[in-house]
């Protein structure tokens, strides 16, 4: 298989390490990386900054027409502005899961994600429905998982880096609620593609997970 046609779908629940691993894997390989969660956060940022109510269908649809998202050098741009840092705000984090449930939002972003898949060589895309919906023809599909305690600890460490002190029990409660939403939503629920390889990252370091994925890429490219 020629390298330029190689596409990897990485899915998993919140805190499974998919974004961190995808980003570092792309840096190691020199490939393109698209974090679809960042796309939802960028769209949420626009709605918050422009005081658009996502519960009001007409206002939301008008706003969606004005939103242009693009990726360049693994950074996300909202209407030509690099918002890679702004989308990590606590306000965006608080609202993104609600915005992500809206069918019109998912439809807009799915169209964009599929366009990116078609136009981008050497692509690593991570999210919750990449292997099942966005890129079902990916050359390699990975589903990352980890136990809830480990995922909560990772989230707590992320929060600490943002200067936010959080309670581990509260994070575990939030993760369980998020899992329930993600697995049971009607539109593109979180699920492992039948041909995806399950990787439990609970006891693995980032480098160990990346080494396993690179071995899987090599194996795929030999077949």
From Swiss-Prot:
Q: What is its EC number?
A: 2.7.4.25
Q: Indicate the segments annotated as coiled coil, or none if absent.
A: none
At the top level, the lineage of the source is: Bacteria
InterPro entries to which the protein is assigned, alphabetical? Cytidylate_kin (IPR003136), Cytidylate_kinase_dom (IPR011994), P-loop_NTPase (IPR027417)
Q: What is its main location?
A: cytoplasm
GO CC annotations on file = cytosol
Q: Where in the cell is it found?
A: Cytoplasm
> Alphabetically, which GO biological process terms does the record hold?
nucleobase-containing small molecule interconversion; pyrimidine nucleotide metabolic process
Q: Do you know which Pfam families this protein is assigned to? A: Cytidylate_kin
Q: Which UniProt keywords apply?
A: ATP-binding, Cytoplasm, Kinase, Nucleotide-binding, Transferase
| Homology family | Belongs to the cytidylate kinase family. Type 1 subfamily.
Q: What is the protein name given in its UniProt record? A: Cytidylate kinase
């Amino acid at each position: 298989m020629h390298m330029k046609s190689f596409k990897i779908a990485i899915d998993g629940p919140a805190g499974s390490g998919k974004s961190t691993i995808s980003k570092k894997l792309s840096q190691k390989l020199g490939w393109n990386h698209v974090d679809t969660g960042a796309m939802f956060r960028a769209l949420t940022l626009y709605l918050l900054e422009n005081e658009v109510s996502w519960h009001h269908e007409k206002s939301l649809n008008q706003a969606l027409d004005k939103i242009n998202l693009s990726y360049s050098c693994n950074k996300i741009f909202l209407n030509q502005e690099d918002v890679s840092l702004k989308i990590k705000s606590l306000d965006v984090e608080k609202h993104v899961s609600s915005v992500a449930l809206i069918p019109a939002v998912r439809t807009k972003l799915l169209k964009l994600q599929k366009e990116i898949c078609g136009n981008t060589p050497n692509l690593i895309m991570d999210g919750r429905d990449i292997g099942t919906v966005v890129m079902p023809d990916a050359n390699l599909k990975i589903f990352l998982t980890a136990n809830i305690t480990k995922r909560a600890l990772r989230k707590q460490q992320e929060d600490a880096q943002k200067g936010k002190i959080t309670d581990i029990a509260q994070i575990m409660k939030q993760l369980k609620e998020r899992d329930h939403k993600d697995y049971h939503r009607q539109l593109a629920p979180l699920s492992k593609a039948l041909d995806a390889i399950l990787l439990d990252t609970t006891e693995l370091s980032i480098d160990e997970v990346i080494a396993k994925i690179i071995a899987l890429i090599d194996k795929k490219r030999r077949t």
